[in-house]
């Protein structure tokens, strides 16, 4: 049986890895082994940070809502409690956007939440 050299297969595999490593720094984009190691690490980071991104945005929305609530004379937890009692089903993303871009509408929502607490 003749000896099979891995020329075409190896070149294809290396090209695939080096193409994915485009934009990496120095030898991490030029050398196959370093590129492969860095690519494995970067895939791990991207998987982990897709989960982290959701938590970070939720934190940011809560901070923005809390700041707007304090301008309306209440804190975040009482505001959320008032919203649930008033039957207002707006998510934190929408509330944070209202707090940043439409303060009058947020004040109206805060007033209705405050009224539901009484």
UniProtKB/Swiss-Prot annotation:
<protein>
    <recommendedName>
        <fullName>Large ribosomal subunit protein bL20</fullName>
    </recommendedName>
</protein>
<keyword id="KW-0689">Ribosomal protein</keyword>
<comment type="function">
    <text>Binds directly to 23S ribosomal RNA and is necessary for the in vitro assembly process of the 50S ribosomal subunit. It is not involved in the protein synthesizing functions of that subunit.</text>
</comment>
<dbReference type="GO" id="GO:0005840">
    <property type="term" value="C:ribosome"/>
</dbReference>
<dbReference type="InterPro" id="IPR035566">
    <property type="entry name" value="Ribosomal_protein_bL20_C"/>
</dbReference>
<keyword id="KW-0699">rRNA-binding</keyword>
<keyword id="KW-0687">Ribonucleoprotein</keyword>
<dbReference type="InterPro" id="IPR005813">
    <property type="entry name" value="Ribosomal_bL20"/>
</dbReference>
<dbReference type="InterPro" id="IPR049946">
    <property type="entry name" value="RIBOSOMAL_L20_CS"/>
</dbReference>
<dbReference type="Pfam" id="PF00453">
    <property type="entry name" value="Ribosomal_L20"/>
</dbReference>
<keyword id="KW-0694">RNA-binding</keyword>
<comment type="similarity">
    <text>Belongs to the bacterial ribosomal protein bL20 family.</text>
</comment>
<dbReference type="GO" id="GO:0003735">
    <property type="term" value="F:structural constituent of ribosome"/>
</dbReference>
<dbReference type="GO" id="GO:1990904">
    <property type="term" value="C:ribonucleoprotein complex"/>
</dbReference>
<dbReference type="GO" id="GO:0000027">
    <property type="term" value="P:ribosomal large subunit assembly"/>
</dbReference>
<dbReference type="GO" id="GO:0006412">
    <property type="term" value="P:translation"/>
</dbReference>
<dbReference type="GO" id="GO:0019843">
    <property type="term" value="F:rRNA binding"/>
</dbReference>
């Amino acid at each position: 049986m003749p000896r099979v050299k891995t020329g075409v297969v190896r070149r294809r595999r290396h090209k695939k890895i080096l193409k994915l490593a485009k934009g990496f720094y120095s030898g991490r984009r030029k050398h196959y082994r370093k590129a492969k190691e860095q690519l494995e690490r970067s895939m791990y980071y991207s998987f982990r940070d897709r989960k982290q991104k959701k938590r970070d945005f939720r934190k940011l929305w809560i901070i923005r809502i809390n700041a707007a609530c304090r301008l309306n004379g209440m804190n975040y937890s009482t505001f959320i409690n008032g919203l649930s009692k008033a039957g207002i089903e707006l998510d934190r993303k929408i509330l944070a956007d209202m707090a940043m871009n439409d303060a009058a509408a947020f004040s109206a929502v805060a007033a209705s939440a405050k009224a539901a607490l009484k």
